[in-house]
């Protein structure tokens, strides 16, 4: 009887019950689970580094994109930008619209002069979705050092924090229900720019 019961139990288990855990958001060693133009992206000492140095990048922004789509999540990391006019960001609930250049459309948690902590609509009508308060950014920003940055996305609600201070906290009803996450390198003139994302922590919210 015990043998028969065990056989029945195994037979009833779906293949999903034996499936491996999903791949980590970022494994800290490689760009497994991510896609982009290889010349611009690498992993250094556990950090994602994007660089357009020394030639810059003209004509379009480019992105390192997750191969998975995500709905609700929390993402935190430290970011440092180098280079005159350096600008970057993290796309949320977005989509790739040009796979050859890895051009992306959707909401972006922005980083760079005049945009730190804002929610920007990359290739969306109207551009800026919600500006961060300039006085709050000025009070906490470390322009030449690593800054703590966090993004929480639940339903249509987005919260962005810079060095612990809330910069955006609101509902965005036109935002898609799911999409990719992507790290941005903004188009820049020579000698280009560099963005380093380290201490990356990610949690899906079920």
Regions found by a protein language model. Give the residues of each.
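Bacterial N-terminal signal peptides
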Residues: 7-16
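Carbohydrate-interacting regions of secretory-pathway proteins
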Residues: 18-206
